[in-house]
């Protein structure tokens, strides 16, 4: 008779333990119900990039002096700078400037070391294409400014968790306002 009683006691203890585990997991689920969703609906919602985000490189042709510092500091010697020496004025004349973003590692060295600040990083990160040759940007394509995510009224902008903490500490500015 005692084995039957101990069997019922073990069964009762296991039932209570299982109910406790189910209750704990249910409480965890309920605690996550109040949180904002982590995923975003990508084509219609986009995250606002941080100020130090390293996206596509923007090139200003008028400022470039063809010094080739960008080529020397690039870890993979990526920028292609073609120039010709103008003998009458003793200056280099830039003929072609191109960067292949299929190979670029977006380290930002070219932007940091450029003496004339003709290179800058943009917030554009949508560089996907079906043909890798379309990722080779010349000076004309590099000179185009991308459309800002904040200025696009068709897209709802979402703040990152670090940006939400900054917003609670600082007053709102144009980079922290979401479009509704």
From Swiss-Prot:
[4Fe-4S] cluster 1 binds at residues 64, 67, 70, 114. It catalyses: a plastoquinone + NADH + (n+1) H(+)(in) = a plastoquinol + NAD(+) + n H(+)(out); a plastoquinone + NADPH + (n+1) H(+)(in) = a plastoquinol + NADP(+) + n H(+)(out). It comes from the Eukaryota. It is a peripheral membrane protein. Binds 2 [4Fe-4S] clusters per subunit. Its cofactor is [4Fe-4S] cluster. Gene3D superfamilies: 3.30.70.3270. Its EC number is 7.1.1.-. GO terms for biological process: photosynthesis, light reaction. Residues 55-84, 95-124 form the 4Fe-4S ferredoxin-type domain. [4Fe-4S] cluster 2 binds at residues 74, 104, 107, 110. GO terms for molecular function: 4 iron, 4 sulfur cluster binding; iron ion binding; NADH dehydrogenase (ubiquinone) activity; quinone binding. It holds the Pfam family Fer4_7. GO terms for cellular component: chloroplast thylakoid membrane. Keywords: 4Fe-4S, Chloroplast, Iron, Iron-sulfur, Membrane, Metal-binding, NAD, NADP, Plastid, Plastoquinone, Quinone, Repeat, Thylakoid, Translocase. The keyword Cell wall biogenesis/degradation does not apply. InterPro entries: 4Fe4S_Fe-S-bd (IPR017896), 4Fe4S_Fe_S_CS (IPR017900), NADH_quinone_OxRdtase_chainI (IPR010226), NDHI (IPR004497). It is found in: Plastid, Chloroplast thylakoid membrane. SUPFAM superfamilies: 4Fe-4S ferredoxins. NDH shuttles electrons from NAD(P)H:plastoquinone, via FMN and iron-sulfur (Fe-S) centers, to quinones in the photosynthetic chain and possibly in a chloroplast respiratory chain. The immediate electron acceptor for the enzyme in this species is believed to be plastoquinone. Couples the redox reaction to proton translocation, and thus conserves the redox energy in a proton gradient. NDH is composed of at least 16 different subunits, 5 of which are encoded in the nucleus. PANTHER family: NAD(P)H-QUINONE OXIDOREDUCTASE SUBUNIT I, CHLOROPLASTIC. Belongs to the complex I 23 kDa subunit family. This is NAD(P)H-quinone oxidoreductase subunit I, chloroplastic. The gene is ndhI.
């Amino acid at each position: 008779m005692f084995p039957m009683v101990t069997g019922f006691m073990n069964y009762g203890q296991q039932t209570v333990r299982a109910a406790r585990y189910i209750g704990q997991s249910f409480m965890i689920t309920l605690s996550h119900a109040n949180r904002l969703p982590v995923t975003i609906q990508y084509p219609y919602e986009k995250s606002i990039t941080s100020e130090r985000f390293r996206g596509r490189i923007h090139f200003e042709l008028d400022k470039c002096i063809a010094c080739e510092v960008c080529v020397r500091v690039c870890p993979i010697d990526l920028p292609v700078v073609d120039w010709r020496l103008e003998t009458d004025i003793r200056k280099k004349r830039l003929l072609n400037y191109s960067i292949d973003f299929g190979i670029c590692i977006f380290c930002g060295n070219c932007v940091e070391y450029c003496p004339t600040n003709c290179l800058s990083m943009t917030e554009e990160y949508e560089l996907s294409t079906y043909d890798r040759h379309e990722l080779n940007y010349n000076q004309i394509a590099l000179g185009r400014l991308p459309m800002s995510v904040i200025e696009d009224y068709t897209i709802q902008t979402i703040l990152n968790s670090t940006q939400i903490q900054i917003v609670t500490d600082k007053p709102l500015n144009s980079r922290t306002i979401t479009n509704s």
